[in-house]
């Protein structure tokens, strides 16, 4: 069956837009709108986000339970209150809808900024699309996080280290994950500027919330945030023991299959970190696009599959990594490489949808954190390819 028509353009008024781009934004709008019209109970995550701003300005502990406002607890840093502020002051449902669309647009923008050729760009969007909808159904912040990580790489490539450092610092002070962007220091032509800008933005965004709260409260809030993250890690492991929706990670798979629920994450994360570091010995490839993009892909995947906080909507970050990994593969694709991508699309992305049998989803995929498995397989392949990078080098024009 020929699917080349997917890469065609359609005309909207005076403008031409690709079918995939059109579907990306239409589905995003429909997805967010469908949650908004179901009522406040369906946008609980957004209520948590809104609460960060409201509690920051009223100087209430950001990390306590507020059952009269929302369910669950907040685990985002105080800087997040500034990002959500413009939406929080809007009428609830309008703010929520625009928040969801911002996430869809920002990830789209980041993917476009990778400057792949048109077909490859659309392939990345297509691979990410189902997972984006999963995240938007939960009005999550994860597409924004994926975009920050991608842009931290893009801006290093564009020699705009001040912007790369800004993405890393702001992301770190809201949800930690974008700290992986510091690896792109290796690819910078202005390493001193990269470090200095990083220090500047870290201090800037750390203190910026004082414009809406007091210095004393902000200082205490950082201690509260740290404690909430420690508590969250412990709760994730408890959730894993119950076969819940948290700890959808490599460690979660190990804990759930082995039923050794006190299995320590460091037995996985430290070896994983070492495997990520080992290919850095190939210094002569630091300027090579394939090498850089492979690193971008495994860092996006690592952020999720080695986090005990990972849940299904978090996987838009990892799947963005899978999409980048696919683009750098040498053609013609081997059966093994094609099978790995199909495995990820089916078990990671489609398993969260109603297209997947509920019995299998509930009794196997969720119970054993199997959503992480295809991304882990691709992560292993990506690390292996980085170690043998000389066999992967492509002409940059192929992207």
Pin down the residues of each PLM region.
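Small-residue packing motifs within transmembrane alpha-helices
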Residues: 14, 160-167, 194, 317, ...
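Aromatic-enriched
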Residues: 35, 326-399
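Hydrophobic core segments of transmembrane alpha-helices in multi-pass, intramembrane catalytic enzymes
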Residues: 141-150, 176-179, 314-323, 372-379
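Primarily membrane-embedded glycan-assembly and transfer machineries that use lipid-linked glycans
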Residues: 2-163, 188-312, 392
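Alpha-helical transmembrane segments in multipass membrane proteins, preferentially the mid-helix core
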Residues: 278-281, 316-329
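Transmembrane helices and adjacent periplasmic/lumenal helix-loop junctions
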Residues: 168-186, 307-317
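A cytosolic-side transmembrane-helix exit/cap motif
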Residues: 145-146, 165, 215-222, 312-320, ...
């Amino acid at each position: 069956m020929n699917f080349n028509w997917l890469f065609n353009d359609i005309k909207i008024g005076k403008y031409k837009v690709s079918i995939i781009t059109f579907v990306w934004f239409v589905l995003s709008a429909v997805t967010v709108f469908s949650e908004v019209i179901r009522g406040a109970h369906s946008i609980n995550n957004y209520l948590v986000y809104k609460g960060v701003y409201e509690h920051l300005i009223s100087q209430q502990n950001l990390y306590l339970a507020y059952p009269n406002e929302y369910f669950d607890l907040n685990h985002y840093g105080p800087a997040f209150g500034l990002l959500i502020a413009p939406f929080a002051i809007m009428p609830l449902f309008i703010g929520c809808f625009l928040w969801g669309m911002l996430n869809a647009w920002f990830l789209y923008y980041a993917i476009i900024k990778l400057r792949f050729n048109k077909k490859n760009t659309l392939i990345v969007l297509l691979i990410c699309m189902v997972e984006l909808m999963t995240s938007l159904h939960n009005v999550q912040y994860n597409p924004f996080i994926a975009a920050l990580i991608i842009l931290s790489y893009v801006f290093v490539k564009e020699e705009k280290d001040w912007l790369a450092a800004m993405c890393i610092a702001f992301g770190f002070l809201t949800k930690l994950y974008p700290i992986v962007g510091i690896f792109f220091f290796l690819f910078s032509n202005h390493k001193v500027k990269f470090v200095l800008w990083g220090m500047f933005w870290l201090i800037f965004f750390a203190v910026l919330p004082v414009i809406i709260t007091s210095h004393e409260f902000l200082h205490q809030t950082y201690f509260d945030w740290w404690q909430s993250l420690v508590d969250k890690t412990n709760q994730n492991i408890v959730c894993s023991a119950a076969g819940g929706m948290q700890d959808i990670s490599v460690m979660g798979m190990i804990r759930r299959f082995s039923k050794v629920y006190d299995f320590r994450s460091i037995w996985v994360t430290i070896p994983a970190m070492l495997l990520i570091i080992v290919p850095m010995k190939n210094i002569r490839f630091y300027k090579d696009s394939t090498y850089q993009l492979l690193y971008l892909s495994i860092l996006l995947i690592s952020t999720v599959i080695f986090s005990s906080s990972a849940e299904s909507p978090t996987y838009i970050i990892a799947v963005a990594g899978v999409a980048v990994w696919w683009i750098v593969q040498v053609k013609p694709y081997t059966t093994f490489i094609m099978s790995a991508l199909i495995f990820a699309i089916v078990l990671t992305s489609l398993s969260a949808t109603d297209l997947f049998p509920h019995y299998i989803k509930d009794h196997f995929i969720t119970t054993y954190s199997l959503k992480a498995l295809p991304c882990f397989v691709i992560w292993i392949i990506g690390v292996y390819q980085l170690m043998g990078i000389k066999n992967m080098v492509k002409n940059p024009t192929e992207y």
